[in-house]
Each structure stands twice: as structure tokens, then as C-alpha cells.
Amino acid sequence: MFGAVGAALYAVLGLFSFLIPGTQSVAVRPAFALVPFFGKRFGVITGFFVGLVGNVIIDLISGYGLLYWNWSVANGLIGALAALIFTAIPPIAGEAVRLVVTAIGALAATAAGLLFVITDMWVQQGVDFSTFFYVNYLPALLANGIAVVILVPALDAAWEPLAKRAGL
């Protein structure tokens, strides 16, 4: 259930984005922060589902279709990796430290998951390693990295008291 809610939120809010000039359709998408957040809070399957399905819906609505399917898989991997990273980290009592660790973990999941888009070298014609790295990966990491470092800790700080009250 949380996966469907997360994917729907990501799909709707993800439409509010803008393309970075000089890249191959890399967009600044603040809603992307929902992917590692749902991974952290609800687990591997939910994180993967939110990233994959949410990104597929965004691409379909935006008119890209399934042309960039590998980016959807990368988004799913980011949600799953966030879940794995935060599962490996023991509970942190201090609020400030927990939020810093949340930002670092979300950024690490984003950096690792986006590496899957190296498949652009085989999926799209004319993409070599240099193009992948400088035109696709780094701009996406920068845009999404800023979003996750700021918004995932903010979402987590807002969610923590609600989760405790609800017994989650």
C-alpha cells in the first residue's frame, strides 16, 4: 500500500520539474526525494516500486514513453539501496545526527543507483562513457543530490513523530 501511495505521489509531484540545459533530458525534480525516503521508511520492495513505477508514470505522462526505461530502473534501485543502507545503520538517538546520517545515506543511494544509467551506452546510440558521465550522470547526481540532501531529512523529520504516534 505504501508503495502505491509513494509511486502516485512521486508521479504527480514529479511533473513539477524542469530540464537542465545541455544535458540529455536530465531534469531537476524535487519530488525525487520521495524515492529514498520511501525506501528508508518502508523497505526495499516499496523503495524500488516507488522509484520504478513513479518514474515510468512521469515519463509516460511527459511523452517520453518507455524510451528511458533504464532511468526508471535506476530510480527503483535508488529506493532499494536506500532501504538497504538504512537497514544496515543502527538506530540513532540524536535528532541532528540522525538527519545528517539520513542525508548522507540518501546521497550514497542516489550516487550508487544512478550508476545503472551507464546502460545508456548500449540503449542509446552515440552515448560513450564521457557522454554518460559528464552529460547524464553528473548533472543527474547534482540535481537529485541537492534534492535528497535537503528534502529527505526534512521528510524524515516530519515523518518521525507521526510514525511514533501511529506505532510504525
Could you say what each language-model-derived stretch is?
Residues 7-11, 55, 75, 110:
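Residue-level recognition of pore/gate-forming positions within transmembrane alpha-helices
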Residues 45-53:
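Transmembrane-helix signature of polytopic, membrane-embedded enzymes
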Residues 1-41, 45-46, 79-87, 152, 156, ...:
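Hydrophobic transmembrane alpha-helices
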Residues 55-92:
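Helix-adjacent hinge/juxtasegments
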Residues 34, 77, 81, 115-116, ...:
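Hydrophobic/aromatic residues in alpha-helical transmembrane segments
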Residues 11-15, 36-37, 56-60, 80, ...:
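Alpha-helical transmembrane segments of multipass membrane proteins
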Residues 18-29, 63-70, 90-168:
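Membrane-embedded alpha-helical hairpins and interfacial helices in multi-pass inner-membrane proteins
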